[in-house]
Amino acid sequence: ATGVARRRRAACRPLPSQGKVLTVDIPNAKSNFTARKAMIYLPPAALSDRPPALPVMELLAGQPGSPSRLIDAGNIAATMNAYAAKHDGLAPIVLVPDQNGEATHNSLCADTTQGNAETYLTTDVVNWAKKMLPVAKSARMWAMGGFSQGGTCTTQLVPRHPEIYGAMLPVDGELKPTNGSVGKMVQEYFAGDRKAYDGNRVPVNAIASSGTSEQALFTGAGERDKESISNMRTIADAARKAGMEVTELIVPGAGHDWHAVQAVWRPGLDWFGERTGLGEMTKSLKEYPQVEVLQ
C-alpha cells in the first residue's frame, strides 16, 4: 500500500462492510439550474467515525438518461464495493448529478439560454461535495467521467476547469455537444453566437485552449461503435498535444452500450485509485480480459 493509503486506513476505523448509495438534493445556488435529484456512492471509509479525505469521481449518464440509470446500468455500487473490499474500505466517492434537468432535454453541459448546466456541474455540485462530504480538495483527486452525452460533457468540462479536475474517463463520447444541427443549437442555446458554441464548448478546442499536462485522459469505446472509436481517437490526439497522459481502450463485442462502460471503468477505477494514492494497480491494462489497449 502507498503511504497515503496507509495513513487513510489508520484514520478511518472501524468500518462498515459495504458502502452506501444515497439520493440527494444538490442546491443550485450559483447556477439556478433545475436538476433532478443526484445520487452518490459513499465507500466504507467515508462512513467511518473519522473518514479520510477521499478522491472523487463525478459521473454523468447519457441522454436520455438519469443518475439512477448510471448507478444501475453502470453497476457502480458493486464495482466500488469490490474495490473497497480489496483496499481496506477505501474507494473514491462517486457523485452522479443530473446534467440535463429531464430525460428528454439536452443541456449541452454548457451555460446557455436554456440553463446554466456547466455552472451547476462544476460549481454547485463541487462546492456542495466539498462542504458536505469527506472529499479531497486538490484537482488531482477529482475525475469526471460519463457515457455517451455524459462522455462528451466530460471532455468539454474537464479541460475548461483544470483547477477542479485532474482526470477524465469518457466512454462512447461525441466530438461535440449535439442536439440537432450546429445552426439550430447556435440559435436555440447561444442566441445566434456561433463563437460561443465553437469556442471552448467543443472538446478538442477546450483541450487546446485550457487543458494542461497535469490532466489525464482514460477513455474507451465499444468495438462495434465505429463513430465513437473515431471520436475517441480524435480527442485522444488533442489530449496528447496538450501534454496529457492518454489511455485508449476498445471493448471487444460491445457497441454504444453499458457493457462498454463497465468494461472501461473497471480498469479505469484501478488506474484512478493508483493515481490518487488509494492503492497500486496489481496488473497491466493488457491483463484486463474485457478490453484491448490502443495506447
Predicted regions, residues:
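Non-catalytic cap/lid and distal C-terminal segments of serine-dependent acyl enzymes
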Residues: 1-295
